[in-house]
């Protein structure tokens, strides 16, 4: 490993090795140890006591963060002509159908979320090879396949995110920006962890939330005591 920069040294000094911080402490500390010139994203990693290889222990869901993600989310709506006006009014960045399907077939994926209607899914199935690996495939479980595309656009723009546990049992997602206040960071983290708790599979045995780490794009991870999440 190369030499630590001055800022990395300062950050390392602020984090006590082996200590599990309260969520309240971590929400302030992550701001103190981030020295980027840009507004870094805040990431949370939660290790769950599940075996994701078993279908009855898969954890996936959606959560509406009270303060949003701080990111500009680019939304494409693939819909029938009668739904286009409502989708545009709701704030969709791109609205249409066949022309965008052709663009995606050609490799265009300059978007963050795709919302569509059940009747359109037959056309979108062929795009799986392009959209699947990028996590862009619309899914009824995440609310991106719906008759009410306008409502779905508003929810995504306001901070609704979807997530799922990876092969190693970790759920990783972004819950805001370093510019958020400690209270906003804490509120978003609490909402996310509360949602995970509600999704605990009945087949999961033992400790469900094994560890929680909060970090920014360029910072070290701060270990959080899971018991502190519900503290007022």
From Swiss-Prot:
The keyword rRNA processing does not apply. It holds the Pfam family Ribosomal_L1. Keywords: Repressor, Ribonucleoprotein, Ribosomal protein, RNA-binding, rRNA-binding, Translation regulation, tRNA-binding. GO terms for cellular component: large ribosomal subunit. It comes from the Bacteria. One of its GO terms (molecular function) is tRNA binding. InterPro entries: Ribosom_uL1_bac-type (IPR005878), Ribosomal_uL1 (IPR002143), Ribosomal_uL1-like (IPR023674), Ribosomal_uL1/biogenesis (IPR028364), Ribosomal_uL1_3-a/b-sand (IPR016095), Ribosomal_uL1_CS (IPR023673). GO terms for biological process: regulation of translation; translation. The keyword Repressor applies. Part of the 50S ribosomal subunit. HAMAP family: Ribosomal_uL1_B. Belongs to the universal ribosomal protein uL1 family. NCBIfam families: rplA_bact. Binds directly to 23S rRNA. The L1 stalk is quite mobile in the ribosome, and is involved in E site tRNA release. This is Large ribosomal subunit protein uL1.
